[in-house]
Amino acid sequence: MAVGDVTMPHMHVVNGVKIGSTEAYVRYPNRRDLVVFKFVEGSHVAGVFTQSAFAAAPVLVSKKHLAESAIRYLIINTGNANAATGQTGVINAQKTCTKLAELAGVESSQVLPFSTGVIGEQLPIERLLDGIQPALQDLKDDAWTEAAFGIMTTDTTPKGASEQFELDGVVYTMTGISKGAGMIRPNMATMLSFVATDAPISQSLVQTLLKTTVEQSFNRITIDGDTSTNDSCIFVATGQAGGVEISSEQDPRYSKILEILQRIMNRLAQLIVRDGEGATKFITVAVEGGENTQECCDVAYSIAHSPLIKTAVFASDPNWGRIVMAIGKAGVPQLDVSKVQVWLDDVQICRDGGAAADYTEEQGARVMAQAEMTIRVDLGRGTAKDTVYTCDLSYDYVKINADYRS
């Protein structure tokens, strides 16, 4: 059961984007599991992908196609990751692009393939290929919610975000979806996300915007510390709402676009954590007082990855010794522990490296019992800060992953 508000918002139509989906029976019966995006000619498309050395076949093909061509289509299947499938997997990903391209009248290099699901099994390629025509016949501009359902695996809820905004008197839209609930620790987490706007943005800035916003969103979440083979995030600017193209970071409209995209990306990333496998609590880990951002990030992830801390949060057990343990093993050079402060929300549990004199277990337990809480750490050695989002670790996480081949 997802934590907090995960309501699917009204998903505004993005001019220049059409979406279709179908039941291809890649793995799941009686549900949409194949999704196609179509972008108007002239759209600018950017992508970032998993840093796993075991990158899946569709990731390899997508990166190659992005470097070669102007992208017109995306095709996404769920239920099978097409990862650790060797050259056959690459050929199958290419076959998918070729079949869609033939039906749509574009080059195969103008198609990006994406897969999510079980690793190590070959795609049921004939079923997938047979599903492409029905998905193309289903193309429409108001199918973002259907697409969000269509890319789910162990997710319990579809994930979406959408905003409309005005720049120089022109109303624009930005809409996106994501999926993921386990195998989530990005550098880039199994995480897929697709965001589009009808604002006019140059190709170079589309890539800059994506890299900038992913760093503080999808690269700042973790559920279980495992990095997927298939992580992919795509940002598209169709330019179909009109206006002069934004081609410089000095353009005053750029900062507004950046702000909105960051908000959309943050929401999509945090929805993944809220829907973490077996999650009952949403945890913000905020670390400040570092000499640099990297050491703050390292400490935050050390806390967020700790199964001892995550199980303590699940049990509402304010065992703060586990938090200082995680700080200590984060590898901060020459950390003066006598300057370290730790809070659970506004309750200080550690002062100057030891137990806060006025802290009581009852105070800590009350915070830990909340559905949402913040673990805040001050390293006392500088002004840098960073934040990571995670969830607790429950019995259900074990059950879900014992029952699901992932």
Curated annotation (Swiss-Prot):
Q: Which reaction does it catalyse?
A: N(2)-acetyl-L-ornithine + L-glutamate = N-acetyl-L-glutamate + L-ornithine; L-glutamate + acetyl-CoA = N-acetyl-L-glutamate + CoA + H(+)
- How would you classify this enzyme at the top EC level? transferase
Location(s) in or outside the cell: Cytoplasm
Q: Is GTP-binding among this UniProt entry's keywords?
A: no
Keywords from the UniProt entry: Acyltransferase, Amino-acid biosynthesis, Arginine biosynthesis, Autocatalytic cleavage, Cytoplasm, Multifunctional enzyme, Transferase
For this record, the Gene Ontology CC terms, alphabetical, are:
cytoplasm
Cite the active-site annotation.
Answer: 190 (nucleophile)
Top-level division of the source organism's lineage: Bacteria
Transmembrane domains' residue ranges: none
Task: Tell me which Pfam families the record gives.
Answer: ArgJ
- Entries under SUPFAM superfamilies matching the protein: DmpA/ArgJ-like (SSF56266)
**Example of a GO biological process term:** ornithine biosynthetic process
What does it do? Answer: Catalyzes two activities which are involved in the cyclic version of arginine biosynthesis: the synthesis of N-acetylglutamate from glutamate and acetyl-CoA as the acetyl donor, and of ornithine by transacetylation between N(2)-acetylornithine and glutamate.
Q: Which PANTHER family match?
A: ARGININE BIOSYNTHESIS BIFUNCTIONAL PROTEIN ARGJ (PTHR23100), ARGININE BIOSYNTHESIS BIFUNCTIONAL PROTEIN ARGJ, MITOCHONDRIAL (PTHR23100:SF0)
The record's NCBIfam families line, in alphabetical order, gives: ArgJ, PRK05388.1
Name of the protein in question: Arginine biosynthesis bifunctional protein ArgJ
User: Which organism was this protein described from?
Assistant: Acinetobacter baylyi (strain ATCC 33305 / BD413 / ADP1)
Originating gene? argJ
